[in-house]
Amino acid sequence: YKTFMLLLVATVLLFFDHSVINNFFIQVVNHIGGNSADMGNAIFLAAVLELPTMALFTKFQKKLGCRQMMLISAIFFSVKHIVTYFAMNMFMIYVAQVMQMLAYAVFIPASVYYVSQLVEKHDMNKGQALVTGAMTLAGVFASLAGGVLLDALGVSKVLMIGAIISVLGTICMFVSVEDVDKHERES
């Protein structure tokens, strides 16, 4: 499971900026002149757009394959984080939030399917727990480091650091994700 370990690293890297943005979203929105109502609208937009993607995941996965879905998710996490970094107004934040439908909403079902196809049946629960643990580790690290970095560096620099970390996560994802659909076809 060597590539699976790198997938966990990719997950931590991708979810670090995701968690920083979510945990400190009001600071991000205020930084570009928005307010709590704008933040609520942005969160609502992302949440509403996640639902159809998750509901249609199986259809997309059968057409594109799980590897492609994992890579699409990683790319859109990074695109979302980069757009958030460059956002100058709420419109750009809303554009970034739209990316959620191909980032988080794809990653959650894709990672479950991926683990179920990659690891042996007796390791499946451990595999799922490790992915969830990687997301949780990113959230804890983002909460601790994000607050300190925001105080020390400000919103813009923290978003830049997060976007760079996210791109590194996407690169790790490209290196680590195997074609598990091939495993399914061979069995």
Model-derived features with residue positions:
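Helix-loop boundary and gating motifs at the non-cytosolic
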Residues: 3-10, 14-42
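Helix-to-loop junctions at the C-terminal end of transmembrane segments
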Residues: 53-65, 150-151
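Structural signature of the two symmetry-related core transmembrane helices
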Residues: 68-83
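Intracellular juxtamembrane helix-capping segments at the cytosolic ends
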Residues: 106-119
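A late C-terminal transmembrane helix in Major Facilitator Superfamily
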Residues: 125-152
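A membrane-interface helix-boundary motif in multi-pass transporters
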Residues: 148-166
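Multi-pass alpha-helical transporter architecture, strongest
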Residues: 163-187
